């Protein structure tokens, strides 16, 4: 029997512990009826198919027009419905047209008795098996089967049909005398002479329900022997007791008695002399089991007869009994079940046993049938071959149905044709018909079949003078339908992993609340039943005295106690209605009254004290005006919701207190008083100055120079101090100090006030406390984590400016200082170009001895702090460059930039390239590459992109050239002509750029020109700043002279791009102090004025030779080195550059100081 499909229960079996009717076995006839119902549904679906009907009509019409008979039409139908003969032609010897065995379809099965259809199918299948095995001899053989034990009706094959033509509906039903009780679907009757043999056996042995006559050649040959069938093989032993009868063919009363005596009470196989054998059994399966084995045993014995009977070895009697009992025993897995059933039936009566054998007990395991497994396997073979046996399998081949695809939403065939199911037979087994279980799916099917299109209907109430509108939803009667949702799984929309017991628990709680009468009708309605709107408005405005004069009969009802179809009949009772005397009381008054009562309850002795009043009460009072609707005081009321964002400080703000001013003044005294640092170097006592603010280095894109203010800073001189102090005071007054007020003792006659650039310190949002925007330093783009390098750079700048102002430029030389201004100040160059001419910045090869000094030089402290970070930055550079050959990284450890005019063996390509690069101006050379800005070394082409493609000889020569020390030489000359480089006061800055590994070598070789431009831009910004400071001091001195000689007012120096100059005459304008630094490509010293006029104000001459001068020069060289190293370190960390060391030397500074 097939297993009944269990619906999914989401992982939990709700029927655990309950009796499951599906686990009990149904009777065979009921199970067969259920299967036939499913098959009838299939047949009805196919017969109702439009495609199948059209195909049948086409076949019939074509056959009728062609003149073919009914046999041709049936043949074509068999070809359509059946399967090709070639599928089973190799299995059996004969291959005929496959006529279906089970041809009882539709309502025809209802005309047969209970279980008769199954027996017909089995018997017809047995005829088909005998035909396929070739054990038939024309029309003479017969197979009979008893329908019931208590009835003498038998099924026999009609005389005139071959075995392969017999179907289930073609069998005739006859009685014990051979009279036809029920004719089959054919016109053939029965053969009474052949049926006599079967009738004698059935009459003598009621336990035999099937008899098969075997008249094939091997069986007839063995039945003709005197010895009969010998126990030579296992096939002969499983037959049990075999009897022999001298059959003559004529049956009279004496012959029947001898046949009964020959058969005996136990034997089920009898050999008919010279005619064959008659195999009997309690079931059709057992009779066919005996027929198969007797044919095999006879064939084996015939093959052994030529050796002689004396040479044959017979199986002993004990072994034969053991083999016979083993063949009747069920398999091991079913033997225990059968033993339990047998033990339970030991105390039952014989009649009850017979009844139990006839009708299987519900819930008991199926009885084992001898030969049932072999017969069922043969039925599967016939079904697979397309014979359609109709056999009911007791042990299905497949345990359960394969898994089906499940979707959340499916489209069921609500109104559709079933023509597409013609070839899809699996859909019939898995379709909606299998789900139509009436016992369990009654409510569900009714819900699924409920209408899904509704119409909104509004019904007026009855029984009230002011009826309300009741909304109802009724099913729409139109034939249009929407798309329904097919639900295969009852838990289809339930989330996975949930427990259905939780739902049942909540459901039980809801029921308990309902039983406890805890469910109310909800909020009370303020709409008065039976009162019109005019009357309601009058009642609302009526006074208490007038309320008694107006009585209204009201009707009220709860919808919860009215049936769904009678909700519009709202009137249940009527009662007089009077005006509520508290209707005139507002919500605010009620809330205030409730709060007063609550406060009085909280008082200790009953006296009212307003101690609980708070600011929140005022908020509540303000909220009641905005929201007049009252709510219960026990619930929280939301007055107002505002969304704000807490302010997040941009940076930590540190405000300097007055107590720290003196400490900071001492710590940073060298920044605001350069003379103090000079006296420290010259072993003089330092001067104390008062500091007001701390300067902040702003990271801006370019320099801007604010206008000069008047009268904001004054320097007072005292009588104490003379001589060299005069020079120092002038230096201090001309040095841009961050709002420092210096008091120096000078002669009284030199007491004067000098105009300076100053502004009142003011508070800013900066975390430095105060800010004074006097001037901005050059741009250094640096990561915020390296913010300390900015301060170090600013400190070194101040030191260098102070040293240059005090030592390298005396009072006379400073009067000669001025910046060459451009004749076209409105022109502006691109910021990406360099501001230093190539005539002043040259890349040269230094001698080997200089190389050793540069390599042995110590690295600055600022660079030592960032070497580890530099290695990590360089390792992160993903540069894929082709390499000509592997080279030792130690060769390029101190490798630096290759100058544009480096000395190499001149070949044609190198000579042309060097000559071209040297003759081109710098602006054109910079256009040959693209600067990457602040993102590091970009994807630009350098001066030597052919290093990877040159020959080995040239590569070796270039490597030898690169191993030498290379320096960037920056010259500050005192003459505007570039050729005058040997004049006094010349500063040379040598910058050594070295590499650390071979990978950096290739990077520099590729991006040499780009990196040079970046380096020039860095140096240019520093020189801009230094020259601006020096020019500013000179302008202060000129302003002082103009003030003493009553000259015209000085024009305000301004930055070109930010403050364009106003038109004025040449007499009222003076030279700008580098007001357009972007246009200045040379920084030189030009003579303005008479040198002799200032000789009397000169300071005492410094000694030409001596220890102080050497100390000053060495200190200045160190300070300039630190400045350049700090600047380079800052740019290296931001641009991922690889500058290693910067050094400065003063080639002709000593001669210039001595000559001055």
From Swiss-Prot:
<dbReference type="GO" id="GO:0051015">
    <property type="term" value="F:actin filament binding"/>
</dbReference>
<feature type="modified residue" description="Phosphothreonine">
    <location>
        <position position="498"/>
    </location>
</feature>
<dbReference type="GO" id="GO:0045172">
    <property type="term" value="C:germline ring canal"/>
</dbReference>
<feature type="modified residue" description="Phosphothreonine">
    <location>
        <position position="611"/>
    </location>
</feature>
<dbReference type="GO" id="GO:0030723">
    <property type="term" value="P:ovarian fusome organization"/>
</dbReference>
<dbReference type="GO" id="GO:0035183">
    <property type="term" value="C:female germline ring canal inner rim"/>
</dbReference>
<dbReference type="GO" id="GO:0005737">
    <property type="term" value="C:cytoplasm"/>
</dbReference>
<feature type="region of interest" description="Disordered">
    <location>
        <begin position="897"/>
        <end position="956"/>
    </location>
</feature>
<keyword id="KW-0472">Membrane</keyword>
<comment type="function">
    <text>Required for assembling actin at ring canals in developing egg chambers. Probably interacts with other developmental proteins involved in nurse cell/oocyte transport through the ring canals. Important for normal neuromotor function.</text>
</comment>
<dbReference type="GO" id="GO:0007411">
    <property type="term" value="P:axon guidance"/>
</dbReference>
<keyword id="KW-0206">Cytoskeleton</keyword>
<keyword id="KW-1003">Cell membrane</keyword>
<dbReference type="GO" id="GO:0030724">
    <property type="term" value="P:testicular fusome organization"/>
</dbReference>
<dbReference type="GO" id="GO:0048477">
    <property type="term" value="P:oogenesis"/>
</dbReference>
<feature type="region of interest" description="Disordered">
    <location>
        <begin position="1"/>
        <end position="36"/>
    </location>
</feature>
<dbReference type="GO" id="GO:0007527">
    <property type="term" value="P:adult somatic muscle development"/>
</dbReference>
<dbReference type="Pfam" id="PF00596">
    <property type="entry name" value="Aldolase_II"/>
</dbReference>
<feature type="compositionally biased region" description="Basic and acidic residues">
    <location>
        <begin position="22"/>
        <end position="36"/>
    </location>
</feature>
<feature type="modified residue" description="Phosphotyrosine">
    <location>
        <position position="627"/>
    </location>
</feature>
<dbReference type="GO" id="GO:0072499">
    <property type="term" value="P:photoreceptor cell axon guidance"/>
</dbReference>
<dbReference type="GO" id="GO:0098793">
    <property type="term" value="C:presynapse"/>
</dbReference>
<keyword id="KW-0896">Oogenesis</keyword>
<feature type="compositionally biased region" description="Basic and acidic residues">
    <location>
        <begin position="904"/>
        <end position="929"/>
    </location>
</feature>
<dbReference type="InterPro" id="IPR001303">
    <property type="entry name" value="Aldolase_II/adducin_N"/>
</dbReference>
<dbReference type="InterPro" id="IPR051017">
    <property type="entry name" value="Aldolase-II_Adducin_sf"/>
</dbReference>
<dbReference type="GO" id="GO:0048135">
    <property type="term" value="P:female germ-line cyst formation"/>
</dbReference>
<dbReference type="GO" id="GO:0045170">
    <property type="term" value="C:spectrosome"/>
</dbReference>
<dbReference type="InterPro" id="IPR036409">
    <property type="entry name" value="Aldolase_II/adducin_N_sf"/>
</dbReference>
<dbReference type="GO" id="GO:0007282">
    <property type="term" value="P:cystoblast division"/>
</dbReference>
<dbReference type="GO" id="GO:0045169">
    <property type="term" value="C:fusome"/>
</dbReference>
<feature type="modified residue" description="Phosphoserine">
    <location>
        <position position="603"/>
    </location>
</feature>
<dbReference type="GO" id="GO:0005886">
    <property type="term" value="C:plasma membrane"/>
</dbReference>
<keyword id="KW-0221">Differentiation</keyword>
<protein>
    <recommendedName>
        <fullName>Protein hu-li tai shao</fullName>
    </recommendedName>
</protein>
<dbReference type="GO" id="GO:0000212">
    <property type="term" value="P:meiotic spindle organization"/>
</dbReference>
<feature type="modified residue" description="Phosphothreonine">
    <location>
        <position position="480"/>
    </location>
</feature>
<feature type="modified residue" description="Phosphothreonine">
    <location>
        <position position="609"/>
    </location>
</feature>
<dbReference type="GO" id="GO:0005856">
    <property type="term" value="C:cytoskeleton"/>
</dbReference>
<dbReference type="GO" id="GO:0048134">
    <property type="term" value="P:germ-line cyst formation"/>
</dbReference>
<keyword id="KW-0009">Actin-binding</keyword>
<dbReference type="GO" id="GO:0099173">
    <property type="term" value="P:postsynapse organization"/>
</dbReference>
